[in-house]
Amino acid sequence: MTPEEEAKRLIAEYEAAQQDRRPIRTYADDQAGPDNKLYSDSGNAERLIALADGKARYEPSWGLWLTWDGQRWTIDHSDLQAQELAKGIAAQLRTRSNETRNEKAQKALHNWSIRSENVHGITGTIKLARSSPGIAISHTQLDDDPWTLNCQNGLLDLRTMILHAPNPDSLVTKLAGCAYDQAAPAPHFHQFLTDTFPDPEVLNYTQRYIGYCLTGDVTEQQISMWWGAGRNGKSTLINIVAAMLGDYAVTIGRDILIAQKHESHDTKFVDLFRSRLAVCVELKETERLDASRIKALTGGDTIMARRMRENYWRFHPTHKLLVATNHKPRADAKDFALWRRIHLVPFTKTVEETDVDPQLANEIIANELPGVLAWAAQGCLEYQQHRLAAPKAVVDATQSYKNETDTVEQFLTNCGIQAGPQVAGETSSTAFRAAHDEWCEDAGENPRSHWNKVSAHLKQEGCVNRRVHGGRLWSHVSMPGITQETTQYDR
């Protein structure tokens, strides 16, 4: 139903309910005397507020109206419903004018009805009404219950799995892609899961994770990375889960997660508002994760965003970050806070090209989404009991990934360098730096930034960089291939 049709329906319903077929009466209509608010934008605003109750709200920081469509609140970028409701007030005033016996009052009502339906009258009415407590609303009030999922057949309490009827007072703006039915079957989906996850512990973990994604809870502070070569089911599963979540799932660009010279525009974060799952597809192995950004997006800190030509506004995260990739991006292996968040889920089974069913995801989405949601809801209950303790396969894969990205350790190992209090040798800083820069050139690392990491690591291990005879030495560092004369000092 369009905003115009919805507004006309509301007006018709109200008129039918009035036995005397008079327009909406408010405080303004019941006042007597020359200074009543009957013939004013303020009086019209009160009529609009009464007519729009439970049907239209206004968010001042966005400068946007929201309308109730029977299941959720949706943004009305054109303000059509508010305008139609305001126009309906003019029609109501004309009806009252025709029914008024007092000739003077009839003329005044008729003139005011004409004034009320011109551009200035409609604009004035809407402008006054939108600041009313019954109309104005903060975006922080929208979708503010992290344990409610708005399904096609009602509001699902994720703690009890009980459905409740849609209610405008719930202030939900999102809608899942299917109805909730605890007994809904999904045979093809379950067979797909069995084929994709040969390790039952990883399958159980994945079910709990997707159940966690039904919620707006972010206490896990995690970024999940689904990794593996092509034809392993990860893209198919993501497409199915995203379809099941509907409005609650969004796709984000990889520039949000990858370190760049220039900051991403704040408009990129708007889609994260009240989402439950944010998916990033395919990162390059030459790209480096932006540790600060990932920690900010997974740590529960307030996110600042804005749409184009809009003031900044803030919100708390409700999304879970999920990366699906064939390649592992680079990451700072020494950043404990980052690696505490990363869970690498290996997709190890590759389907033979001749066995690939290109329509599998579409068939499941078309026929089995309620069953997928029932499976995810069970995972949500299990998550609430057991949280997201990672199975051994995920722990091992994540540790292996961390080792691969530990370029400092790779440099020390490849060059045969020993460092620590137990090492008695001293090494020329100049020779050490030259060997380091040569290694960086071969490894594709930036020498300057990587040297800072190496230096910080050595100092953390108890090594000392000291000045000797006009040169510098690294104490407690031993590097083969450097002569005794060079290790004594730099000239």
Task: Give, region by region, the residue ranges found by the protein language model.
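Alpha-helix boundary/N-cap detector
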Residues: 2-5, 36-39, 43, 77, ...
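Short hydrophobic short-linear motifs embedded
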Residues: 5-6, 10-15, 19-27
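Feature primarily recognizes SF3-like P-loop helicase cores of small DNA viruses
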Residues: 22-61, 94-491
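Trp- and S/T/G-rich repeat-edge/linker motifs of beta-rich repeat architectures
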Residues: 64-67, 72-89
